[in-house]
Amino acid sequence: MTDADFQNWLKRGGRFVALVEVQTSPVRYLSTVAYTTLPTDTPANRVYSPVVAGGVALSESLPLDGSATRSGGDIEIHNEDGALDGWLSDVWTNRRVRVFVGDVTWPRADFRLIFDGIAAGLESRTAGRLNITIRDKLQRLNTPVSETLLGGARIMSKIRKFLP
C-alpha cells in the first residue's frame, strides 16, 4: 500500500481498527474491533483481542527552545467482567508498546505504525476499565541504569575524615 492509498483511505473512511501490541510476558495483542491476521500474513492467523475501548489518546509538544520533552497517553481497556484483573499483577513498566492503524479487511502488512513507545504502567482508574499509560521512548532515560547505590553511612564517614 502506498502513502497515497493510505491517505485516500483516511479521507473516504473505512472500517477503522487500531492494533496494540504490548511486549509483556506473554505478549498482549489488543484491538478496537475483532481482528485476526490472514493465513497469508506473517505471522498467520494471529488473534487480536477486541478489548481496546475507543481509541488511543496521545499528547505531544514541541518546545521552541529545542529541548526534549516526553509525550504520553493512555489506552483504555474494557474489563467489565473482571476477566483481565490478573493483568494488574504483570510487569508493564518499560515494556514496548506499538500501535498500528488500518482497515479490518487489510492484511497486517498494510497497517501503519502510529506509535512506538513504552508502557509506564497499568492501573484501574474506574470500575470495569484498565488503563495502560504509555510514554515515548525518552521515558527509558528516566530510569536508573543500576540499582547499586553509591555512598552510604560507612563510606561517608571515611570521606569526612578528608574534608576540612
Where are the regions that the model predicts?
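Juxtamembrane "anchor/assembly" segments of surface/extracellular structural proteins
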Residues: 1-164
